[in-house]
């Protein structure tokens, strides 16, 4: 649980913040948010090339000057903000491998830069080479269908006599909401192909940045909870599709019913969201797919 609490929710926040500022044409603030996101997890850096391209108006005069400004905003600024998150390590004397360069051969490159580069290379080697088998590993292909949610905690007991009890914290989204959002993503892609409006473009950009890069690391051990950064854009996709459905004349009562069903589904799964002890049979009834166990 600590990994999600300490990292992923803040990564998601800064990605959303960067997206909001980009949409509002506040590029400096968007770049700062990207740097902060990258400081939480390197996957935040995926925003840099995408947002850089989005921010450039290629049909506008003064392209060279515009490029210089955008490069400063979306490349240099995120790097500086990212480096600022390392200040605690930089100004320490006993951080991990802080004095690594002292034991190496002499170089014209300052020891501080060599130490920092070494630390980053070690991080990169660890994460790209992380292929240990794990019972809850989940390939990105399965994330959109809730193929293998991560169990953070499970405990069984005999307190519910004559039957046993189960207590679990399962990192899973509200199934009805998640599956509806996945379907809406496919619909959004279709609508974008038909009419490339700003909203659908922004939603799909968010999905591309937060989801597709994971497919380049097929041999790496990955988990479903990495999808937490995708979830805001999936929800936006669902809201977008609902909005388009209302514009096309669908009755609001159907939407209200759908929202109500999602709420009921959320309440039903709440015990496994927060680790409430329930009868084993009740827990088993909530394991809709065998891969959830």
How would you label these PLM feature ranges?
Residues 59-72, 185-205:
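Membrane-interface helix-loop-helix junctions at transmembrane boundaries of multi-pass membrane enzymes
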């Amino acid at each position: 649980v600590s990994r999600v609490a300490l990292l992923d929710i803040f990564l998601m926040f800064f990605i959303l913040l960067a997206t909001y500022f980009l949409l509002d044409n506040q590029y400096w603030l968007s770049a700062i948010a990207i740097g902060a996101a990258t400081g939480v997890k390197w996957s935040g850096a995926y925003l840099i090339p995408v947002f850089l391209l989005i921010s450039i108006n290629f049909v506008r005069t003064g392209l060279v000057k515009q490029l210089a400004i955008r490069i400063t905003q979306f490349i240099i600024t995120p790097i500086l903000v990212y480096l600022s998150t390392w200040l605690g390590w930089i100004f320490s004397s006993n951080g991990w491998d802080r004095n690594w360069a002292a034991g190496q051969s002499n170089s014209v490159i300052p020891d501080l830069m060599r130490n920092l580069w070494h630390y980053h290379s070690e991080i990169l080697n660890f994460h790209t080479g992380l292929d240990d088998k794990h019972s809850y590993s989940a390939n990105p292909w399965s994330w959109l269908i809730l193929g293998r949610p991560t169990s953070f905690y499970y405990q069984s007991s005999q307190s519910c006599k004559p039957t046993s009890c189960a207590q679990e914290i399962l990192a899973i989204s509200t199934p009805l909401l998640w599956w509806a959002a996945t379907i809406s993503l496919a619909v959004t892609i279709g609508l974008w192909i038909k009419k490339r409006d700003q909203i659908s473009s922004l939603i799909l950009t968010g999905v591309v940045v937060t989801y597709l890069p994971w497919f380049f690391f097929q041999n790496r051990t990955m988990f479903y909870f990495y999808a937490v950064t995708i979830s805001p854009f999936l929800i936006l996709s669902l809201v977008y599709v609902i909005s388009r459905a209302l514009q096309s004349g669908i009755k609001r009562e159907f939407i209200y019913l759908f929202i109500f069903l999602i709420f009921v589904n959320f309440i039903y799964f709440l015990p496994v969201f927060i680790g409430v002890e329930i009868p084993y049979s009740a827990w088993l009834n909530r394991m809709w797919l065998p891969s959830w166990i």
